Design a protein with these regions (language model features):
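N-terminal leader/targeting segments and the immediately adjacent pre-domain N-terminus
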Residues: 1-119, 147
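Active-site helix/loop module of the DD-peptidase/beta-lactamase fold
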Residues: 143-177, 205-208, 234-274
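Active-site-proximal alpha-helical segments within enzyme catalytic domains
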Residues: 135, 222-231, 270-292, 356-372
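Active-site Gly/Thr loop motif
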Residues: 253-260, 308-367
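Conserved catalytic neighborhood of penicillin-recognizing serine enzymes
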Residues: 159-186, 191-214, 219-224, 274-277
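Short, charged, amphipathic alpha-helices and their helix-cap/turn boundaries
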Residues: 75-83, 108-113, 186-212, 237-256
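Active-site SXXK
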Residues: 107, 125-148, 170, 226-230, ...
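Short active-site loop at a secondary-structure junction
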Residues: 92-100, 115-144, 150-161, 211-218, ...
């Protein structure tokens, strides 16, 4: 551990890896002689300065930093707090480790609770919540004419059936690429991403299991390929970073980081950090179908697109066989059953590994965030 260089190195046998911290983009893992980006060149790569918003401490969430304004009845508060007590307790056969819970109703912060050491502004790992962030960025770029989601990527290495893959297929997990998303096997594709210098290259080289659009298979590879495609379309990491952070500022989000790999690809879908209140803002933004502070940030049709269930055959290897839209899971009864049985049919959610949830319930004007490191 080197505090002066803000880096951590580890070595197993002949393999050495170093993680370096860079302002604005978080930590990047690089290896010796990777042939991609050495540590020195990565440190010379400085992200554009996107100023933070000066959110007033006396202005209520979501436009300011003020906390809960108590409007719940004692009965409702007791019910919610009782449920939270269960989430924060460890008297179960598996690790719960809840970090935070926050609830917004009708656009107001009505409940929040944090584990010791966690604050409303603490950036927390969202893991696959980054897939939702990537889809929101795609909506912004699509509306601006910077991205055609139905245009084939035409990746030069794809000279077979994969040549038909578009951003739409990547966002809806219907690319047809064969990718092992399991985490139980240490050598699975998903686990290999954590030690890869170029995550998109590892993903691009996967073979096609089915033609694009015919099969739903949830895979982080789709999000990483999409992120690399954004770099190509926008002119590199710095521009992709700027587009993402500018979108976040438009919806009052200051504490959101999507880290980059050693090749310079933002790792949407697995290495994102965002604070609890900012996750709640993301959910509120989706509930409002792209409206923020009286302005249209992303057109309403994009959120209809996100909530359109994928019409493709379910791959048997999916660990979660539920309805998916674009970047979000849908709480539909048919054809696979609800992902959250106690919630209404119109509910949808961003979902990250180890229990990261951003749940939106339009019919109740409700947004719920839960973060943690739950193992089950």
């Amino acid at each position: 551990i080197n505090s002066n260089t803000q880096s951590v190195s580890s070595k197993i046998l002949t393999t050495k890896k170093t993680a370096i911290y860079r302002e604005g983009i978080g930590c990047t893992l690089v290896g010796d002689n990777s042939g991609i980006s050495d540590e020195a060149s990565l440190r010379r790569q400085v992200m554009p300065n996107i100023p933070l918003l000066a959110l007033d401490v006396n202005t209520p969430w979501p436009m300011g930093q003020q906390g809960v304004i108590q409007k719940l009845s004692p009965q409702v508060f007791s019910m919610i707090d009782g449920a939270a007590n269960i989430q924060f307790s460890e008297n179960k056969t598996y690790q719960v480790a809840t970090h935070s819970i926050a609830i917004a109703h009708k656009g107001e912060l009505v409940y929040e609770r944090y584990a010791p050491g966690i604050s409303p502004q603490t950036p927390l790992y969202g893991f696959s919540l980054g897939k939702t962030l990537a889809t929101l960025l795609a909506g912004k770029l699509s509306a601006n004419g910077e991205l055609n989601i139905h245009q084939p990527l035409a990746n030069q290495v794809w000279q077979d059936v994969r040549a038909d893959i578009s951003s739409h297929h990547l966002l809806t997990m219907t690319s047809g690429l064969q990718f092992d998303e399991s985490y139980e096997d240490a050598t699975s594709d998903a686990n290999m991403l954590f030690v890869a210098d170029d995550m998109a290259e590892l993903s691009v080289n996967k073979v096609a299991n089915a033609p694009a659009g015919q099969e739903f298979k949830y895979s982080t590879a789709n999000s990483l390929i999409f992120a690399e495609y954004l770099n190509q379309q926008l002119g590199g990491l710095e521009n992709t970073y700027s587009e993402f952070q500018n979108l976040m500022r438009q919806i009052s989000v200051n504490n959101a980081i999507v880290q980059a790999d050693g090749h310079g690809t933002m790792t949407f879908g697995m290495q994102d950090l965002i604070s609890t209140r900012d996750l709640l803002r993301i959910g509120q933004f989706m509930l409002q179908k792209g409206q923020w502070d009286g302005q249209e940030v992303i057109p309403e049709y994009w959120f209809d697109y996100m909530q359109t269930p994928v019409a493709a055959t379910m791959n048997a290897e999916n660990s979660l066989k539920k309805s998916y839209g674009a970047g979000i899971w849908l709480n539909l009864s048919e054809p696979y059953g609800k992902i959250l049985p106690s919630l209404p049919e119109d509910a949808y959610l961003g979902l990250g590994m180890r229990g990261q949830y951003v749940i939106v319930i339009p019919s109740q004007e409700l947004v719920i965030v839960r973060t943690g490191t739950t193992l089950d």
